[in-house]
Amino acid sequence: MLNPIENRHIGRFRIRRRLINKEPRVVQAIMRNIIVLAAEQDFATDTITYTAIGNVFESVNVNYEVPMYRLAFMEHKGDVAFSFFKEKGVY
């Protein structure tokens, strides 16, 4: 497995505060495979924007803008499946 820190697999994504409060188990499953570097509260959208390292993100060159990802998840019979999709032109 690639080392996400050495290979700079970095991304940003948002999670609604409502999801954190109502479905913490889903958020725990998402956070299990990443290392959060920063979290920023956005009161206007009631979301938290995370900057994180993990193999779920593409490699980013030094001095490049960290890309934004859209998080999609599905819960079925207690199992949580999720994916990160890189947003085009959003940084």
Segments from the language model and where they lie:
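Detector for the mature cores of small, proteolytically processed
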Residues: 1-30, 37-91
